[in-house]
Every structure is written in C-alpha cells, then in structure tokens.
Design a protein with these regions (language model features):
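Short, solvent-exposed helix-loop connector elements
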Residues: 21-37, 65, 88, 178-184, ...
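Conserved, surface-exposed functional patches that form binding/active-site neighborhoods
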Residues: 5-14, 44-58, 206-210, 214
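Phosphate-backbone recognition surface of nucleic-acid-processing proteins
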Residues: 1, 128, 133-140, 145-245, ...
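Short helix-capping/linker segments at secondary-structure and domain boundaries
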Residues: 16-19, 48-49, 110, 151-155, ...
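Basic, amphipathic alpha-helical segments enriched in Lys/Arg and hydrophobic/aromatic residues
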Residues: 231-233, 237-283
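Short alpha-helix plus adjacent loop in nuclease-associated cores
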Residues: 1-24, 28-29, 74-80, 178-191, ...
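Glycine-rich, often acidic, oxyanion-interacting loops/wings at catalytic, nucleic-acid
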Residues: 36-131, 216-222, 230-232
Length: 283
C-alpha cells in the first residue's frame, strides 16, 4: 500500500495536482505559540473563576447589589466579608481565591509579552496587524491571532479559500442531482473561526465609528479605512436581513463572520501588496 500511495503521490506531483501546504516561518510560529498560550491562560482563568463563584453560590454567599463580578470591589468583598465557620472551608476559599489571582497575573504577563512580540515583528506583519484593527470588532489581540494563524493573507487567491480554511463554509452532502447543504464544516482552523465569529457580534449594531475604533484607524491608510466602513455597512445589513428572515442569532453571526473573512482578506492583501511594491519603487 505504501508503494502504491507513493507512486500515486509522485504522479500527482508531476501533473501539478498537489497543492503546497503553508509552513509557518519562525516568526509566525513563535507568535502563534505565544497567542495560543494566552488563550490557554484565559481558559484556565475562566475555570478558576467558575470554581470560586460556584463554591460561594453553593454556600449561599451572594454578591452584594451594585457589585460586578471579578472587579476589584468584588475581590475585596470576597477577601474581607466572606467567612466560614470551619477551617477547612476557609482554606478552600483561600486556595480558590489564590488561583483566581494567579490566573489574572498570568494572563496579564502573557499580554505584555504579546505587546513586546508585536514590536519585534517584521514591518509587513506589523502593518497588517494595524490595518486589521480598522475593522469593527477586531482589536489588537484578534488581529494578532489572525496573523499568527493565517500567515500572509495573499497566499489565498480568493477570499472563499480563506473562508474554507477557517471551516466557516457550509457542509455539503450531494448525491446525483440532489444537493443538500448543512451546518458549517468546522474542518478548518478553529482558532481563526472563533475569532471571526466573536468579532461578527459587533456588526449587530448600526454602523458607527466610536472613539476607540477611531484611534485604531489612525494607523491605517484612507483606503483601508474605506474598506472597514464598507464592511460595517454591508455586514450590518447582512445581519439585519438574516434576522428579519427568522434566522437564529448564532447562525446569523456565523454567516456574518464568514463574510467578515472576505474583508479581512481584502485588507490584508491590499497592505501586503502595497508594502511589496514600495521596495521596488525605491530601488
């Protein structure tokens, strides 16, 4: 079987039927490791918070009115106002609280490391990260994750290829003339798919440029800013249209996220090509 497979691969390679797989370079791989470490830390932080909150709930300790969970005021309340009769429960509370604080410190430390890593990236990667932040719903961490998971966006000839890479396209079950489309395939990059779906929730709001988004867009060219504004209008209309047709919010946001990938591709390719032309013009 191995010999037959090898011969088949050799024939496919000779005929040009094989598609090369992108292998991340050292810079992309290092950034990907750091970004995924931060994601793991956030998930551990969520688990630690759940343990503490469920422990307090199980013993009837309710958060005071006007106090939001996991703020400094909330943690001060846990440390000073929550007490138990038995020493074993006091130790349990102390341990859960320590884990929550440790997880928060870990996330903050990794986010500082990501900031430092961005400053050390090649100019082209930094430019794409800045440009992607012109899109509503995509701040620095989301842009860095996209860059780390995808690499150069210009390696995709068409935005549909990027959509398929993320696994955000519809699955298909076809037999003869009968075509059946189902839920998204989820066969692509789960990290990329998660980021764009989270970002897509921002487009349920009417198009607008707030203070935070305006600050991010200062680092982008007018062409990139125009594409980001076009994305706001188009994706909000898409969201409103699908909701109006009775689609559930999760399905709608997934569809908007898939279309958002098209704008991510357009902006990334625009910046990469623009930077690749400049050195030749200077020469």
């Amino acid at each position: 079987t191995d010999r037959r497979d090898a011969a088949k691969l050799a024939r496919s390679y000779r005929s040009g039927d094989l598609t090369a797989v992108w292998v991340p370079d050292a810079a992309h791989e290092a950034l990907r490791d750091l970004v995924r470490a931060r994601l793991a830390a956030k998930r551990d932080q969520l688990r630690a918070r759940h343990r503490l909150s469920k422990f307090l709930l199980r013993h009837g300790r309710r958060t005071p009115e006007g106090t939001n969970a996991w703020t400094e005021k909330y943690l001060h309340w846990v440390k000073t106002a929550v007490h138990f009769e038995h020493t074993a429960q006091e130790v349990t509370l102390s341990d859960y609280l320590h884990e929550v604080e440790h997880a928060a410190e870990r996330v903050a430390r990794l986010e500082r490391s990501i900031d430092a890593a961005i400053d050390a990236l090649p100019a082209k990667m930094r430019a794409v990260i800045d440009a992607l932040q012109s899109l509503r719903g995509i701040a620095q961490l989301s842009a860095v994750t996209i860059m780390a998971e995808v690499g150069e966006l210009s390696r995709f000839e068409h935005p549909r290829q990027l959509m398929a890479y993320s696994g955000a396209v519809s699955s298909e079950h076809t037999s003869g003339e009968r075509v059946r489309r189902g839920a998204i395939s989820k066969t692509g990059n789960a990290h990329l798919r998660r980021i764009v779906v989270e970002a897509a929730w921002a487009y349920r709001h009417r198009p607008a440029v707030g203070k935070t988004l305006a600050l991010r867009q200062r680092r982008s060219s007018p062409a990139v800013t125009a594409m980001a504004w076009k994305a706001q209008n188009r994706l909000h209309q898409r969201y409103a249209r699908l909701i109006g047709r009775g689609k559930c919010k999760q399905q709608t946001v997934t569809a908007v996220g898939r279309e958002l990938l098209g704008f991510i591709w357009a902006i990334g390719v625009h910046v990469e090509r623009e930077l690749s032309v400049r050195p030749r013009q200077a020469a």
